[in-house]
Amino acid sequence: MFKRILVPTDGSELTAKAVAAAIDLAKAVGASVYTLSVKEPFPYSAISEMQPVPPQEFFDAQERIAAERVNIVRTACKAAALACEAHTIEAVHPWEAIIEHAKTNGCDLIVMSSHGRSGVTALLLGSETQKVLTHSTIPVLVVR
């Protein structure tokens, strides 16, 4: 069955459902949990004087937020007596980072939440979950 389950987190309420499902599944099959929070890169501007936040402040804030997100998952895993490996990385395209992280860590399942978009909104905006589903060779469990 599954040995290593990756559950990416963006800190949302919907992601919390995916985390709970990943923990339940990991307990049932004896798997370990990996969690990942993807940080946004700094939005450099051609007009450097117009930056709303200095780059270092931006990076520090992104790291703090990402660390808080993975620590929530780590704490939930600890409460369930599960091993959890937590990582934060920076990427332009979170879906690519999620797939690459799963491959690099030998994960055999990715658990993600569906953000519930439908119709034209889903078509125009897409979602990281949809992109992972489309491009991943690793099985993906989508929690709604």
Which residues does each PLM region occupy?
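Short, hinge-like loop/turn segments at secondary-structure boundaries
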Residues: 51-54, 102-105, 128-129
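Structural beta-alpha unit
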Residues: 75-110
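Small/aliphatic-rich secondary-structure junction motif
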Residues: 3-52, 76-85
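Short, well-ordered secondary-structure micro-motifs
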Residues: 18, 45-48, 96-99, 122-124
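A short acidic, glycine-rich active-site loop
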Residues: 54-68
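Glycine-rich, Arg-bearing micro-motifs that act as flexible, cationic patches
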Residues: 109-134
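Short hydrophobic/aromatic patches at helix-to-coil boundaries
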Residues: 139-144
